[in-house]
């Protein structure tokens, strides 16, 4: 807990100052003077001839201390024995030169000056205190207007502004003494010091009770907050105006002589000099009684000089130095990436480090790295010196140095000793996740490059094309221990992001293993039988059997009981070799490798070995298969030439067929049968299908099995082997080499209609080449942007989650979330077993339909239990989650579940927040940057139908169907679902049916897999007539609300609803189509008895004419999907950022807040009013305003359920939280984020997203303050809220009422309780201004604060030590308290009086000296 500030140089044995928290507040003039060692009167710095500091200047030795250790300026006193003497000649105290880093000075200002932070940092604190606008304040401060401070008996008002003329007139009118008005900072200072804070707070509270309206209470609350914070912190408002200016120690703004008699100086000296010059001039002018106007001008200049010193450029012109460069002010020293916080406090350069290029080291073990001798010698120098001395080879450091410089042979022997079992850390920038720094044991090598083990490359994301890596030496024993136990590469087999092995073979190794495990027909030695592995090896060496021949052989295995048995397998020599490397374990049988191994399979094998055979075995196994992979790939001699790229013969027939199709589409377009947009979509569709087809043909050709004349199977195509094994190259790349390149996208994401038909083997035509430059250039630009964006996202995530640490074992909460399989478009993308793995069950999990418990409550679900859950067909499981954890600080281990990188329950002290942030941010660079627009996806066609993914029985939910004239079933409802139920009655899939879809199956029908269930129009959203009748147009006026589009190419016209609000006459129109009864001429009515009318939205295409007869199920109008677009797919990184920043989408969906019936109210000018009348009478009806012309999918009288969309679009996460609660929000966030990553094939565990969402939900917004001190609309932490409410309840007062709110990650980081952490993140000046006004205390609980003040972080081993210290401290405290109580009771007995006796009762504290075990 306790931290040394610095050792006292004068008294090293004095106890060091310790602290537990840091407080920031305003400094009063007295406080500034108490820091100061003297006033600085002159702007001079140092004498240019003698280089000695000038007296009373900015570097004055008398004020700040001596230049040399223990030596005064004139040289009269030298050496230690005069320590503490003040020289009578030059006035310098004889002491350490170091005091020049800590002694401060001050400048007495001739006129008060406003502190720019409190003036200009919005909202202006001075302005809020005085209830004045910033503009008025500046007018007073910069001497444009007078302000009335004391109106007296005149009819002026307090705080009124007057110009010079008005002021003089008023003086003439009322007399000079009748009222007080003033100008400049003095006036503001007088007003601030006159404020009675308690009185003001009272008045404001009274006003707040009576205030009505929207803005007034907000304004009052703002002022009340600041008044209260001044009251609580003990600051005075007038301290925001400076009368004394502190001067920072000279060593912190150094003046350095350069060669050639010039000086380099810190900008601060320039800024201070300007202030001193102007201040001195002002003093002189006041003494000389100069005219007012001159003095004022000088005061204004002084104010500007001080402003520039504190925050240059915040107000007025930026003050520049000699070379037109803006001067760096005090604020700039703190701000930004180059500021104090991020440059020097959060990251520092360290010694004992080096960097060099990396090369591969395939003969290393997994825990080793090759370190060049020269580097090791330099890095381990002090260790070598001490060993040399210990061995008696050198008596002094100087001698040792000489030996090392000469590189004598004994030095190398000693280096070997020193380096033995001393791990070093290797780091590759960018360190995107914790696996970017790992520990290895160094092996000395010749040469100058670091050797890296090939298996750890994927963790470092390293390759050997010139990458560099840095080496760091952990010095202390503790550091070495942590490096070995926590950071050793052998201890980091699993990835913390998803729990899968990250130490996996890649490239050559995969290819080698693939080749080894191949099986080919008709090879030499096929059908032979062998008795043991050794015999097979023998036969291979003798050339009697081929690596790929099918043979029968015996191999040792372990059965279920754990006995060694010998089993026979049909296999190949290659697979047998691999099986021989497997650790003997019942759970890792030979079947594991008795198959063709691709990259995924190899990862699976490693995972299985790690889970069941332990870490040591798996590390040895990894090393062995790496060696084998390299060896076999080398022996196989796989390589390819241009002839291995096959172009299928069927390519041109396919292409020509599609060309004809495209011609046909063009013709249809010319004839006006389809619109240009439809033509574009169809053409793009056709070409993308063609390109896929050609690729398919090519893959079929290239993967075909071929035989030689003897009937033996030939080796497969080399390119195919590389791609199929997962070593290098993807089908997409092969398609470009041997198929056709396909469609290209323009830089804005649109797709060019003409595809590139050639492939790289044939070569591109000039035109095709030109078309392809688009994509290539965009790719490069994207990559550069992506890296920066991804890094910034990671930084924000880390900042919001940095104080989320596992603090307790179990918080005992009853809350939980429900996990079920993730289904996307009716396809299970992540099964339930995968989602609950490594979580703690919140309730007993039962076999459906029985009482058999699979997993008991509070048990960790491991692989075995997850399999049981899967086999039992459980639909959903209640699991503990960080979201619902109720731990006081951080989260508890039970809610978090398994530590993915270790495979066991998470340890207390694990920094799960940072791990979550890294896991989400690290794959960021793999995500795409672009926002897709529907109508341009280079991957091809729009899906327009859905097939059954499983067999089962169809069940309709909330059916609402209509049969049209052709006998087709059309969906008319908005919340109809279609479910597929299996034999056991378990729901296997549910699909939401869109309005206007055609359903091909009946309720209760049994379907096979791939039966077409329903289809819809992917390009437009239809509006369908419910009943037969005559269509009647209302307010569809040609030229105002309808435009006729004539297609130039085809001459066809379409009637399209245009935006009628933009026309002058169209303000009140409500364009709609009504279905009339042809007999009566009245509108037809629906079941609810309302007239059937269809309001038209902008851009709708009318499909009927006025007065045309329509049948039930006919399409009245079509809305293009672009207009009522299902959603604009923001893809990739921007989507993830949008979700975590909790931004409201542009056209966000409107969600029904409760169950009820839809009513359309009276319309506004260009908004429509929708009201929901709740079923439950106790609730109020809710109104929504929807812009006219937006498509509203609900009708008058429709019943909606809580959480239904009244308007389509992306839902705003805030609404989901408010209406449906935390769990629904969690599910939404997890699904949306996972969808983005899933598209890229990145696996991230859900719990990481939950941790981040938990951090976004920390704050509560006060809805009703009750009788507490909290204010309506204020954001407070849950802990704070509970504390205040508890206090209120104890006193019998009404508690405050609040609801959780969702903050975006940037907002949440800036609102954290620690001001140090917030200031080091963003908007440094604003955070510090706010914190100092409130007198905030930083309790140093998060990681960042502790790093900044230079302590161990309170996580991991640092957390353990601080916990032990706390226990010890508490125990000591108990003993002290008991002793004190004893002493007091003894004193009380000696002098018996009535009051004191009951102190003795506290004696019971003595018993509990053994610390509480829970700590």
Swiss-Prot record:
Cofactor(s) this protein cannot do without: Mg(2+); Zn(2+)
Underlying gene: rpoC1
Chain positions recorded as Mg(2+) binding sites: 463, 465, 467
Transmembrane regions: none
Subunit and interaction comment: The RNAP catalytic core consists of 2 alpha, 1 beta, 1 beta' and 1 omega subunit. When a sigma factor is associated with the core the holoenzyme is formed, which can initiate transcription.
Enzyme Commission designation: 2.7.7.6
Biological process (GO), any one: DNA-templated transcription
Top-rank lineage group of the source organism: Bacteria
Broad class of enzyme this protein falls into: transferase
Name used for this protein in its record: DNA-directed RNA polymerase subunit beta'
Species: Cereibacter sphaeroides (strain ATCC 17029 / ATH 2.4.9) (Rhodobacter sphaeroides)
Binding site residues for Zn(2+) 2: 811, 885, 892, 895
Cellular component terms per the entry's GO annotation: DNA-directed RNA polymerase complex
Keywords assigned: DNA-directed RNA polymerase, Magnesium, Metal-binding, Nucleotidyltransferase, Transcription, Transferase, Zinc
Annotated catalysed reactions: RNA(n) + a ribonucleoside 5'-triphosphate = RNA(n+1) + diphosphate
GO molecular function, one term: zinc ion binding
Residues reported in the UniProt entry to bind Zn(2+) 1: 72, 74, 87, 90
Function, in words: DNA-dependent RNA polymerase catalyzes the transcription of DNA into RNA using the four ribonucleoside triphosphates as substrates.
Short name of any one Pfam family annotated for the protein: RNA_pol_Rpb1_5
Family listed: Belongs to the RNA polymerase beta' chain family.
Cofactor remark from the record: Binds 1 Mg(2+) ion per subunit. Binds 2 Zn(2+) ions per subunit.
């Amino acid at each position: 807990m306790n931290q040394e500030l610095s050792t006292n140089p004068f008294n090293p044995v004095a106890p060091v100052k310790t602290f537990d928290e840091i407080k920031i507040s305003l400094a009063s003039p007295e406080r500034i003077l108490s820091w100061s060692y003297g006033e600085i009167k002159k702007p001079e710095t140092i004498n240019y001839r003698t280089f000695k500091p000038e007296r009373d200047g900015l570097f004055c030795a008398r004020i700040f201390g001596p230049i040399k250790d223990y030596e005064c300026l004139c040289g009269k006193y030298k050496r230690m024995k005069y320590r503490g003497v003040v020289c009578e000649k030059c006035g310098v105290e004889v002491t350490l030169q170091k005091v020049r880093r800590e002694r401060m000075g001050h400048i007495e200002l001739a006129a008060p000056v406003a502190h720019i932070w409190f003036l200009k940092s919005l909202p202006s604190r001075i302005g809020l205190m005085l209830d004045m606008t910033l503009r008025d304040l500046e007018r007073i401060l910069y001497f444009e207007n007078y302000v009335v401070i004391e109106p007296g008996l005149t009819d002026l008002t307090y705080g009124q502004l007057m110009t010079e003329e008005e002021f003089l007139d008023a003086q003439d009118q009322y007399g000079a003494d009748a009222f007080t008005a003033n100008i400049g900072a003095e006036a503001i200072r007088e007003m601030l010091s006159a404020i009675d804070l308690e009185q003001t707070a009272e008045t404001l509270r009274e006003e707040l009770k009576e205030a009505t309206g929207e803005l007034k209470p907000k304004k009052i609350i703002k002022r009340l907050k600041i008044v209260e914070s001044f009251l609580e912190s003990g600051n005075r408002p007038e301290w925001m105006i400076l009368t004394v200016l502190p001067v920072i120690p000279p060593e912190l703004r150094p003046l350095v002589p350069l060669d050639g008699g010039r000086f380099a100086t810190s900008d601060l000296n320039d800024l201070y000099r300007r202030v001193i010059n102007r201040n001195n001039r002002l003093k002189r002018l006041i003494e000389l009684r100069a005219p007012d106007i001159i003095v004022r001008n000088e005061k204004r200049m002084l104010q500007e000089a001080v402003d520039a010193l504190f925050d240059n450029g915040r107000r007025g012109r930026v003050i520049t130095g000699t070379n037109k460069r803006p001067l760096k002010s005090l604020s700039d020293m703190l701000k930004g990436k180059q500021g104090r916080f991020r440059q020097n406090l959060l990251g520092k350069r360290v010694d004992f480090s080096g960097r060099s290029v990396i090369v591969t080291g395939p003969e290393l073990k997994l825990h080793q790295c090759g370190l060049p001798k020269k580097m090791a010698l330099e890095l381990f120098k002090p260790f070598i010196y001490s060993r040399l001395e210990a061995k008696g080879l050198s008596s002094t450091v100087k001698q040792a140095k000489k030996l090392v410089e000469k590189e004598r042979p004994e030095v190398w022997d000693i280096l070997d000793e020193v380096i033995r079992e001393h791990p070093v850390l290797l780091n590759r920038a960018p360190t995107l996740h914790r696996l970017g720094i790992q520990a290895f044991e160094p092996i000395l090598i010749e040469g100058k490059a670091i050797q890296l083990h090939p298996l750890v490359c994927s963790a470092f994301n390293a390759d050997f094309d010139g990458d560099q890596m840095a080496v760091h030496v952990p010095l202390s024993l503790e550091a070495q221990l942590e490096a070995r136990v926590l950071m050793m590469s052998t201890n980091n087999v699993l990835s913390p992001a998803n729990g899968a092995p990250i130490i996996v073979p890649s490239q050559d190794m995969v290819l080698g293993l693939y080749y080894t495990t191949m099986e080919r027909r008709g090879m030499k030695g096929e059908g032979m039988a062998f008795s043991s592995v050794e015999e097979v090896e023998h036969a291979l060496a003798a050339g009697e059997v081929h690596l790929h021949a099918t043979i029968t052989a015996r191999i040792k295995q372990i059965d279920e009981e754990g006995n060694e048995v010998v089993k026979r397998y049909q296999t190949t020599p290659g697979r047998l070799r691999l099986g021989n490397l497997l650790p003997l374990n019942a759970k890792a049988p030979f079947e594991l490798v008795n198959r063709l191994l691709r990259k995924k399979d190899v990862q699976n094998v490693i995972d299985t070995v790690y889970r069941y055979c332990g870490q040591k075995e798996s590390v040895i196994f990894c090393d062995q298969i790496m060696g084998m992979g390299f060896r076999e790939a080398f022996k196989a001699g796989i390589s390819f030439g241009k002839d291995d790229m096959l172009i299928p013969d069927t390519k041109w027939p396919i292409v020509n067929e599609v060309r004809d199709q495209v011609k046909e589409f063009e013709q249809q377009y010319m004839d006006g049968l389809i619109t240009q947009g439809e033509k574009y979509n169809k053409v793009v569709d056709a070409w993308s299908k063609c390109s896929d087809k050609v690729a398919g043909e090519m893959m079929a050709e290239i993967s075909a099995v071929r035989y030689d004349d003897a009937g033996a199977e030939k080796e497969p195509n080399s390119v195919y082997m590389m791609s199929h094994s997962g070593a290098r190259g993807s089908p997409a790349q092969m398609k470009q080499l041997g198929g056709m390149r396909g469609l290209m996208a323009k830089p804005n994401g649109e797709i060019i209609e003409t595809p590139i038909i050639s492939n790289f083997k044939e070569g591109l035509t000039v035109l095709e080449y030109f078309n392809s430059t688009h994509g290539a250039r965009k790719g490069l630009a994207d990559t550069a942007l992506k890296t920066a964006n991804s890094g910034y996202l990671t930084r924000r995530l880390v900042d919001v989650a940095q104080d989320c640490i596992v603090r307790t074992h179990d918080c005992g909460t009853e809350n939980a979330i429900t996990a079920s399989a993730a289904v996307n478009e009716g396809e299970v993308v992540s099964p339930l077993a995968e989602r609950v793995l490594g979580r703690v069950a919140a309730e007993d999990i039962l076999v459906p339909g029985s009482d058999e418990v699979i997993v008991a409550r509070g048990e960790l679900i491991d692989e075995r239990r997850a399999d049981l859950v899967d086999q039992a067909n459980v639909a959903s499981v209640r699991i503990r989650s960080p979201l619902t954890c109720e731990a006081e600080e951080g989260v508890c281990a039970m809610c978090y579940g398994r530590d993915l990188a270790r495979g066991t329950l998470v340890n207390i002290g694990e920094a799960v927040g940072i791990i979550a942030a890294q896991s989400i941010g690290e794959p960021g660079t793999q995500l795409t940057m672009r926002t897709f627009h529907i109508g341009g996806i280079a991957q091809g066609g729009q899906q327009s139908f859905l097939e059954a993914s499983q067999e089962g029985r169809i069940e309709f939910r909330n059916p609402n169907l209509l049969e049209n004239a052709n006998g087709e079933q059309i969906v008319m409802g908005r919340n109809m679902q279609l479910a597929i139920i299996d034999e056991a009655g378990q729901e296997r899939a549910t699909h939401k049916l869109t309005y206007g879809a055609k359903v091909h199956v009946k309720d209760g029908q049994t379907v096979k897999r791939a039966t077409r269930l329903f289809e819809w129009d992917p390009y437009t959203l239809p509006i369908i007539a419910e009943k037969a009748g005559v269509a009647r147009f209302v307010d569809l006026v040609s030229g105002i609300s309808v435009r006729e589009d004539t297609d130039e190419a085809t001459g066809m016209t379409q009637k399209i609803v245009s935006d009628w609000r933009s026309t002058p006459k169209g303000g009140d129109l409500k364009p709609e189509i009504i279905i009339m009864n042809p007999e009566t001429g009245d509108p037809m009515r629906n079941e609810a008895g309302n007239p059937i009318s269809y309001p038209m939205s902008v851009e709708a295409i009318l499909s009927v004419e006025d007065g045309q007869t329509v049948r039930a199920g006919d399409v009245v109008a079509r809305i293009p999907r672009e207009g009522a677009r299902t959603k604009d797919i923001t893809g990739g990184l921007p989507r993830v950022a949008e979700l975590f920043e909790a931004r409201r989408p542009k056209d966000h969906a409107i969600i029904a807040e409760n169950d009820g019936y839809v009513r359309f109210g009276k319309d506004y000018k260009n908004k429509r009013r929708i009201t929901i009348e709740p079923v439950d009478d106790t609730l109020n009806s809710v109104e929504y305003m929807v812009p006219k012309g937006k498509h509203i999918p609900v009708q008058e009288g429709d019943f909606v359920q809580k959480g239904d969309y009244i308007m389509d679009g992306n839902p705003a996460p805030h609404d989901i939280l408010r209406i449906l609660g935390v769990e629904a929000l969690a599910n939404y966030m997890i699904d949306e984020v996972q969808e983005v990553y899933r598209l890229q094939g990145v696996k991230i565990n859900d719990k990481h997203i939950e941790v981040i969402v938990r951090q976004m939900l920390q704050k509560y917004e006060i809805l009703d303050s009750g009788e507490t001190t909290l204010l309506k609309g204020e954001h407070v932490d849950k802990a704070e809220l509970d504390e205040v409410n508890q206090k209120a309840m104890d006193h019998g007062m009404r508690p405050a009422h609040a609801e959780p709110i969702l903050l975006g990650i940037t907002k949440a980081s800036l609102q954290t309780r620690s001001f140090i952490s917030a200031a080091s993140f963003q908007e440094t000046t604003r955070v510090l201004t706010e914190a100092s006004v409130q007198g905030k205390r930083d309790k140093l609980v998060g990681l960042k604060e502790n790093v900044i003040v230079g302590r161990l972080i309170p996580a991991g081993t640092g957390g353990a030590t601080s916990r032990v210290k706390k226990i010890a401290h508490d125990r000591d405290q108990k003993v002290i308290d008991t002793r004190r109580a004893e002493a007091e009771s003894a004193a009380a007995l000696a002098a018996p009086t009535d009051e004191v006796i009951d102190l003795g009762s506290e004696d019971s504290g003595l018993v509990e000296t053994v610390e509480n075990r829970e700590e």
